[in-house]
Amino acid sequence: MKLVLAIVVILMLLSLSTGAEMSDNHASMSANALRDRLLGPKALLCGGTHARCNRDNDCCGSLCCFGTCISAFVPC
C-alpha cells in the first residue's frame, strides 16, 4: 500500500516538474497544494500516520480525521 502511494506521489511530482498542464484548474490547484505540502518548509513540521492533528496541514501526506493523521485511502 505504501509502495503504491509512493509511486503515485512520484508520478505526480514528475508530471508537475515537466510542465504538464492539467485541463481542470481545481485539479491543478490540488496538485500544487500537494507539491507545496510535500516540498515546502512546513514539511518538516508535519506528523506521520496516527499523529495528533487539528487540520490536514498538520499531517504529512495524510488527512486529519477526528484529531488523528490517517492514510488518504482510509475514509473518515
Curated annotation (Swiss-Prot):
An example molecular function term from Gene Ontology annotations: toxin activity
Cysteines engaged in disulfide bonds, as pairs: C46-C60, C53-C65, C59-C69, C64-C76
Cellular component GO terms, alphabetical: extracellular region
Record carries keyword Cell cycle: no
Subcellular location, record wording: Secreted
Keywords carried by this UniProt record: Disulfide bond, Secreted, Signal, Toxin
Main location: secreted
Signal peptide: 1-19
Propeptide regions on this chain: 20-42
ATP-binding listed as a keyword: no
Tissue specificity: Expressed by the venom duct.
Similarity comment: Belongs to the conotoxin I3 superfamily.
Domain commentary: The cysteine framework is XI (C-C-CC-CC-C-C).
Protein name: Conotoxin Ca11b
Organism: Conus caracteristicus (Characteristic cone)
